[in-house]
């Protein structure tokens, strides 16, 4: 094992590992999502294991790798992958309906540069992703966990941001978008305190034209929420 490879279960303290950043809802899958899941899971999904992924073997190239944590229904994920065939994308999601929906998009558009892992993202990062192997993280509209007592569950919070930083290559980035101002302020503070990360902008980033509008973004705008974007880079 070289110095850049993972050391299992050492990045996030044990008491934090029991704190989940999501609630596993049991929503129904549509018939189409079920068909996609059954037909294409083995083709486009990577089973969770405690062995690191070799991205060059997986994608059959050495293109940059971007990981999206919590892709929802995956519409924006598929669009970004389609628009950027020179980059590889790994989407991590726990909700079967979203996995089923995105599987259909991947198959229909033949997105050979996109794969899925259906599992808890923190465990995936700890056990399947080598240190200094990722070119970027996309975190679009994560659960804001609005009540103060639940802020510890937020994905963009230390020590989870320390874990993200360790997985990034030098020059890699974390791109977060949220419509909850309190979360944006908190995330900026947490990321600013994370070793080796620095904001690309004085504070919030301008809207990135290449990012498609998501369903959650439309809901936030309908409620007149302000969309805040953060981009931090590893130096």
UniProtKB/Swiss-Prot annotation:
Protein name, as recorded: tRNA (guanine-N(7)-)-methyltransferase
Could you say which EC number(s) this protein's record lists? 2.1.1.33
Organism's domain of life?
Answer: Bacteria
Annotated binding of substrate, by residue = 147, 179, 214-217
Q: Which gene encodes it?
A: trmB
**What GO MF terms are annotated?**
tRNA (guanine(46)-N7)-methyltransferase activity
> Which Pfam families does the protein's record reference?
Methyltransf_4 (PF02390)
Under HAMAP family, the record lists: tRNA_methyltr_TrmB (MF_01057)
Q: In which pathway does it act?
A: tRNA modification; N(7)-methylguanine-tRNA biosynthesis
Give me the Gene Ontology terms describing cellular component.
Answer: tRNA methyltransferase complex
Record's Gene3D superfamilies?
A: Vaccinia Virus protein VP39
Purpose of the protein: Catalyzes the formation of N(7)-methylguanine at position 46 (m7G46) in tRNA.
Q: Which reaction does it catalyse?
A: guanosine(46) in tRNA + S-adenosyl-L-methionine = N(7)-methylguanosine(46) in tRNA + S-adenosyl-L-homocysteine
Summarize where S-adenosyl-L-methionine binds, as residue positions. 68, 93, 120, 143
Catalytic site: 143
Q: Where is the signal peptide?
A: none
Q: Show the PANTHER family listed in the entry.
A: 3-DEOXY-D-MANNO-OCTULOSONIC-ACID TRANSFERASE/TRNA GUANINE-N 7 - -METHYLTRANSFERASE, PENTACOTRIPEPTIDE-REPEAT REGION OF PRORP DOMAIN-CONTAINING PROTEIN
Keyword annotations: Methyltransferase, S-adenosyl-L-methionine, Transferase, tRNA processing
Family membership: Belongs to the class I-like SAM-binding methyltransferase superfamily. TrmB family.
The answer to keyword tRNA processing applying to this record is yes
Q: Which InterPro entries match?
A: SAM-dependent_MTases_sf, tRNA_(Gua-N-7)_MeTrfase_Trmb, tRNA_methyltr_TrmB_bact
